[in-house]
Structure formats: C-alpha cells, structure tokens
Amino acid sequence: MAGITEHSTIMNDANFKEENAHLSDASIHFGSSEQDKTPSDYELDDVLDLYNDTTEDDADDADDVNNYIMSPSSSLSSESEHALDALVYPIYSHHNILEHENNSDYASITPSNHPAFTSCAYLQNPVVDSNNEYESKFRLSLEIPPTDFLSTSTELSKRESCLSTETSSSKFSAVTAATITNETQSEKRSSQTDPSLPFKTNSLNCDVTYEEGPLTKKLRGPKKYKPSHSSWDIYGFKKANQFYTVDQYNTWYGPYSRYLERREQRWKLFLQENGIDYIHQSPSIFPSRSAKTQRFIRKGIPPEYRGNAWFYYSGGYELLQRNPKLYETLWRCACIKKPSDSDLIERDLYRTFPDNVHFRHKSKHSRNSSDASEHSSEEPDVPMISKLRRVLMTFATYLPENGYCQSLNFLAGFFLLFMSEEKAFWMLVITCRKYLPKMHDANLEGANIDQSVLMASVRESLPAVWSRISLNFDGIPVNDIVAKLPPITLVTAAWFMSAFVGILPTETALRVWDCFFYEGSKVLFMTALCILRLGEDDIKSKSEQTEVFQVIQDLPKSLLDANAFLSLCFRRNFRRTPSQKDIERRREKVAKKRNSSASKLEMSDSSKHHLSRSSSRFSKSHIISQLHNHLKKST
C-alpha cells in the first residue's frame, strides 16, 4: 500500500542509548534481552512478506499443532486466579444501598456475604407521614431468589395507594409491566408515576438482551466476503474517507477478500485439529496459547469467530462464569439510580459510529453524518444504541471510581458489533482494569503513564522523530517526559484511549485488536511506534510544529492495507519495541516517579500539558479538539 515503505536505516540496538533518558535502566532495554523472549518470539518471521494472493501465507500453518485444549484461565499465561478475581470490583459482590432524606446520592454502600449473581432488587417505602407526603428514605436490598429467573419488584406506598412495577426476566429476555393498585378499588389500571417520585416508571426499562453481535450472525452466511460495489464495507462502515476513495478501497479489498476466505478455511482446520466444534455454532473455546496460535492470531481471526476469541483469550469467560447475572443486576441498579455520568453517556450515544449502519436509524441513512448525533426523544432508539446505553450505564455503576470517559463509547460499540451486551460489558471491564489500567480514570493517570513510556520508546528507537515531536508549542524541547509530556501526546493519547478505534481504518484496527487481546498492551506500543516509523521521513521534512502535528494525526488514517501494516509491526528489523514485561516495569517506574513528584507538579505550570479527564471533556468531547485549540494559539 502507498505510504508503507521499508526504511534502509535501522537503529543499532546495542550501541544506541539516549544520553539523558530519565527512564533508562542498564538492565532493561526496549530491545528485550534473549532470556526474556518466549519461544514464539523467534518464530514470527514466517508472517512477513507472505500476504499476497497466493497460499504462501499458509505454508507454516501445519507446525506445532496442539492436540489438547486448555481452559481460558490456563491460557492466560501468568494470570493467576487471584489476579483474575481482582478484576471484579469487590463492593458489588453484594450490597445494600440506603438513600436518606434530602440526599440524592447513596449515603452508604455496605457489603454483604451474599453473591450478587441470581439476585433480585427490591425497592420499598413502607413509611408514610400523616401529611400524605412521600418520604425520600428508601432501601434497596439484593436477595437471592429461589430460581434462575431474576425478578425485580419496585414498590412505593402512599397512604391508601401504592405503585408497583414488576419486572420478570428469563435468561433471554425481560418483560416490564407497570400497574397501580388502590386498596379501595379492586381494578388495576395503568398510570403515570407521581412527579415527586425519585424516578418515572416509563423510564425504568430494564430489558436486557442476550443475542450475539450483529456481525457474528451476518458473517456466517455464504459469500460473506464477496466484494461489492456498495458504499459500505462488510462491517457496516463507510468504505471511503478523505484519504482513499471507494474505488481504491475496492481495489484493495478484492485480493484481501480471497485472503479472508483462505484464512477462514485454515482456521477451521486448526479448530478441528484441536477437537473444537465450529460447524454447529461459533466456538466458545479456542486452541491454547502457542507459537502456532500466535501466528494464526497475527494473521487475523475470522470475523465470525472474532468476538468469542477476544472474550476467550482475555479471560472473559472466567469472569462471566463466576459472576452470572451480575450485569443484569447492575443494570437494574442503574435504572433505579442513574450514575453521575449518565448525561455524558446520553450525549455520546448518538456520536458513536454515526456512519455505521448498525448504529444509525433507518431514516437517517440518507442524511449527513453530522445529523446522526441529533436525536429526537420521540424517535425510538435503534437496538444497538439501547445496548450501548445499558453497557455504559452499567459500567459506570460497576466502577464508580472509573465512571465514564469519552472513548469508552467507541470501545463498547466495537465490542457490541461482535458479541452480546453482557460480554461487551465484561470486555470493557477487562480492557480498563487489565490491559489499560487507569487509562480512563478521572485523572487519566494511566494515559499519562503510558504516554511517558511511549515517549521514552520514541526517544530511544526513533531519535530523529523525537527531535521533532519533543518540542512544546514554544519550540522548547521537553527533557523530563515524566514531569511534563510533550504536546504531541494529545494526539498519541487518543490512540491509546480508543485502542486505535476510529484512528486506523476498520480492518486494520480489528487486526490490531486481534493481537491486543491475545498478547497484551505491548501491541498498542508496537502499533504506535510503527506508525511513527512509517512517517519518519515526512515528520523530518516539516519545519513548522503545526505541520508535524498534522502529519502525525493523519498518518494512521491512510493505513488501509492491514496485512502490510501488521507484517511491518512484527518485523524484527523494523521495530524496536518493549516486551510486555518491559512495559510493566516501566509503567511501575513512571508511576513511582509521578507519585513522588505529585506535589511539585501541582504547583508547577508544567502540569498544564498533563492529560486529565477535566481537560478532555470539552467541546465535541474529543481530545483532538484540545490539540486544535493549542494549534490555533501557536499560529
């Protein structure tokens, strides 16, 4: 593909060392030591230069066949059972919530010994004063029901009448019925809730669906990869953008569609060799971790299997089995008491993939994408928007210290295309707690840490690029990348926070995700460094800082050829990236240094270039907007 070229100048791993690298460690280099490498790291050359319209890329697929299946937990490498348990937020194992008078927030959340799964929420208010006024004090308690069915009953009493809302849901669906009962009348009739109540009955829609993602079903049929002249790709996104036309996309996709068909057949043989049934249903278990599995992952997971494969290799099935019904229970809690970020969530729902056919209302297909964010309250939501709302509201309820941060909507939306909303919720939890720790917290601490690690990697691996991007808006180099991040991180932080969704073309982003959920966060660092390496010549040729920003912002959007890009990412003589162990060590080192100098940073003007949730929630809700503001000031 145009834009992806090989560079003749390769950095010398042994001799290069940045003179004043604040994160340098004599025993730790981004070019990992031999003893740190796994056997699979030595067998990756076979994915290089093999992506063409032949069967050459399949030549190595017969090696290292595993004749046994490991459980998800045993395939999590060093992930221990204790570490897996740590992903589950302990306060929600079971809780009682009390709301006191004149207090809109829960006054206390007390843990209980009962598990939260297969529980039912019961809201009651038996106390009424003599003036026929509602008391605002009520209790929400979670109790274990005798069956697998989840029943939620909400009752609010008012002297001679009470309003009750009963919701019964099975494993597959939920049906909500609201009735009002008067003790002096035998008939039941539908009614609106008194406006003084803490919530309205018609807003308590606790239905949860368990259907799989729309793409999983769509991509099972025959001729699913067949090229078409439609303006939409197989995932429902627009083919064309400002960097390539529909014709250019179709020219690339023709050979790539045959590659997808061929790889799917190789995957079916791979699953069959491991005793996994793929004929009657999409597999929920996959081959154990090995050099061969890694090669298959890096060559791309078939779209039909993609959601289940992500869920399996990330440990999602373990969490789901240990916490059945937790998602549904938390959603019901969110119905009763909306999380503090609910307004932000509602605002971003209709900005999530407005050009994707699965997220757009049918009446809007002929409108401009800018109109997609405008939504009428009278117009019913499309199913994907309703699912996205439930996932994000439940996530904000489950992790209140994390809450909601813009870019989580794109992560959740991508998950929902390939899996059920319950699995999408757990994948969002795993991503934020395991793969990108503290990345989306209120102060974006994880984003700052990872950007420090990335900048250190650029400084060591790409000194020519570093000399151009290390300048602040005044043209002064940034030396201490822990105390003060270069302004360019306003761009690269968005890469990490979205895991390249909306940054790279759809197919390329999906291929990065295949590797990301199998190998860990090191894949994001490899991807970022590869992008900067590809644009090194353009970056060095720009004299103005604003031009450098524009080049880096536009670089990933043109990387349509997923095969060519992934092959370069994993090419040994093209990259100098850290191993996962190196990343964890450097994250820990940066975190310690940031903690030790936190008080100084608060008193220093240098902290203005550190990322924070407050600085990222502004006009258009995108971190790139802040970059544009800086660029305007500098011109």
UniProtKB/Swiss-Prot annotation:
Principal place of residence: cytoplasm
GO BP annotations listed: actin cytoskeleton organization; exocytosis
The UniProt entry's GO CC annotations, sorted and at most eight, read:
cytoplasm; cytosol; plasma membrane
Residue ranges, annotated region (Disordered) = 361-381, 581-621
Q: Cite the Rab-GAP TBC domain residue spans from the record.
A: 300-520
Q: Which GO terms describe its molecular function?
A: GTPase activator activity
UniProt keywords, alphabetically? Cytoplasm, GTPase activation, Membrane, Phosphoprotein, Transmembrane, Transmembrane helix
The organism of origin for this protein: Schizosaccharomyces pombe (strain 972 / ATCC 24843)
Protein role? Regulates exocytosis by functioning as a GAP for ypt2.
User: Where does the UniProt annotation locate this protein?
Assistant: Cytoplasm; Membrane
Phosphoserine is found on S191
Question: Which protein, by its recorded name, is this?
Answer: GTPase-activating protein gyp3
Which residues lie in coiled coils?
A: none
